[in-house]
Amino acid sequence: MKEKIVLAYSGGLDTSVAVKWLIDKGYDVVAVCLDVGEGKDLDVVYSKALDMGAVECHIIDATKEFSDDFVSYAIKGNLMYENSYPLVSALSRPLIAKKLVEIAEQTNSVGIAHGCTGKGNDQVRFEVAIKALNPNLKAFAPVREWGWSREEEIDYAIKHNIPVGINHDSPYSIDQNLWGRANECGILEDPYAAPPKDAYDLTAELEDTPDTPDEIILSFKNGVPVQLNHQDYDLDQLILTLNELAGKHGIGRIDHVENRLAGIKSREIYETPGAEVILKAHKALETLTLTKDVAHFKPVIEKQFAEQTYNGLWFSPLTDSLKLFIDSTQQYVEGDVRIKLFKGNAIVNGRKSLYTLYDEKLATYTKEDAFNQSAAVGFIDIYGLPTQVNAYLHGGYSNE
């Protein structure tokens, strides 16, 4: 009896070529494809995997689990790698790894294969997550073992009649889920080259966007959006709805050169219309509900959490601790945020909360002012005392 290997199967170039390669190596291939909200035709993926020779193909709808258990933390934690990338692909990898391990254990497979190259982030994310969940499973990386270029993979696919939907003229590598879309390769590898129109799919060109804005209200509870325009939504459906609504206004385009885990720089094109709207709204609400010290310290945790996620360390003691901190800050992040969507911009123009720490009577400069301005004298004396003592000792700072 042949040994079984579970393959993370997307139906794209790398994993389609990997099916044939693993079969030629003498393994039975168990293909696994997760739906995490990318809008892919899963019936086609299922049939394609079996046509390629896989002995089984498991299609798993994980969209809700992805949104509730992973994307929710990206929202509560305002997660952005290098202040630019909202972790579109990185967020889905631990969930995919989790499901791969579950299928491997159910089918008595000896290991798990993926279609990642030897210089990308995903090889690390998958293999570290798999070892964290089941250290006895072997990892197989056919594309890394070949060391082939993308052109050589395409040639191999053409030679063996493997349908992959791309060619030498359009060699994009695309990854998509409900949190956004990532695109690389081809002309995008030149960081000075303007992305062609066909590099985008979720967002409209600015010249094609409506000349009338849309104004929406997002309602949050415990740091997560639960309503759009006062209508209840599950998180996954709310994100998908915002992707369409914000996308038509050209919102969410990111052209970013990022520092990969493997030490190289990579130019990536991201489209994250729903994510941009939600994250802006969430940050706006936090300005009302977080105390000053929490608001100033939380970004330190957010940065570490984003790097943990990007670097494939979701299943780790540190990440568990970071999640606990983030959750502890979100108890009172509840309220409404009003946002205008127009010409590539998501503009926050109002926010309110029952738990607001903003006191208009303390903030106002009108006669309704309740702030005790005379208290400022003593505060300034005490606050500035170290500076004053230093000046007495050293003669003060020169104006020169």
From Swiss-Prot:
Subunit structure: Homotetramer.
Chief location of this protein within or outside the cell: cytoplasm
Gene name as annotated: argG
Name of this chain's protein: Argininosuccinate synthase
Sequence positions that bind L-aspartate: 117, 121-122
A Pfam entry, by short name: Arginosuc_synth
Residues that, per the record, bind L-citrulline: 85, 121, 125, 173, 258, 270
EC category: ligase
GO BP: any one term: argininosuccinate metabolic process
Subcellular location: Cytoplasm
InterPro entries: Arginosuc_syn_C (IPR048268), Arginosuc_syn_N (IPR048267), Arginosuc_synth (IPR001518), Arginosuc_synth_CS (IPR018223), Arginosuc_synth_type_1_subfam (IPR023434), AS_cat/multimer_dom_body (IPR024074), Rossmann-like_a/b/a_fold (IPR014729)
Cytoplasm found in the keyword field: yes
Enzyme Commission number: 6.3.4.5
Gene Ontology cellular component terms for the protein in this record: cytoplasm
Catalytic activity reported: L-citrulline + L-aspartate + ATP = 2-(N(omega)-L-arginino)succinate + AMP + diphosphate + H(+)
Family matches, as HAMAP family: Arg_succ_synth_type1
Organism: Staphylococcus haemolyticus (strain JCSC1435)
Family note: Belongs to the argininosuccinate synthase family. Type 1 subfamily.
Keywords for this protein: Amino-acid biosynthesis, Arginine biosynthesis, ATP-binding, Cytoplasm, Ligase, Nucleotide-binding
Gene3D superfamilies for the chain: Argininosuccinate synthetase, chain A, domain 2, HUPs, Single helix bin
Signal peptide as annotated in the record: none
Pathway, per record: Amino-acid biosynthesis; L-arginine biosynthesis; L-arginine from L-ornithine and carbamoyl phosphate: step 2/3
